[in-house]
Amino acid sequence: AGLVGGGHIPKPGEISLAHHGVLFLDELPEFKKNALEALRQPLENGYVTITRSSVTATYPARFMLVAAMNLCPCGYYGDPHKDCRCSPQQIHQYQARISGPLLDRIDIHIEVPAARYQELSSNLPAESSAQIKERVNKGRAIQRERFKDERIICNAQMSHKQVKKFCALGKEENELLKMATTELNSSARAYDKIWDCCEIQHKYNFRPITCVFLASYRFNSL
């Protein structure tokens, strides 16, 4: 109830409180299975419906989901410096807590290695918050102009028809996208998301092989 909302008298949960914002879920597999599966409707439609015996309530829930998880219970599966203590069955069961349909609604999947001492103690300059803000504002401005005559406000809300309308790729890019998604046996939803990301990169020093690179963001060891 705390995540999606509920109670005897329905109240909005965290996903509705994060409407038009960012919802960060750490240790994703540790959430209850039914709570995770309840995320599928709002991630798809931007709202959540809660039904109780005497009342049905619908709350807005269009948010950006950012989730983090280990790949196994001990946390060291895939670590090049420390051995994993989990059995193959334990690893499979742990990763299986995140269903395929839920993973399919998460646009980008990235494995992040643990930061080492040399990286943490480095004096090399990092991108500042002001620079990141500038990039975000630039992206938002592009989307506002793109969707000024539509009933959506960002790329993530595009339908398949709108992806085809706004995300024009060249012949070579289309062929690479087709090859990548066929080899990876991706769903129609994943195809649209990769297509959208390819078009975005097309505006920033895009190369055809980027389609294959972006497709890899949809598929990791899960």
Annotated model-derived regions:
Residues I9-P10, K33-C211, S216-L222:
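Basic, amphipathic alpha-helical bundle interface domains used for macromolecular binding and assembly
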Residues S16, E30-F31:
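Extended, folded domain segments that form the structural surfaces/walls around functional sites
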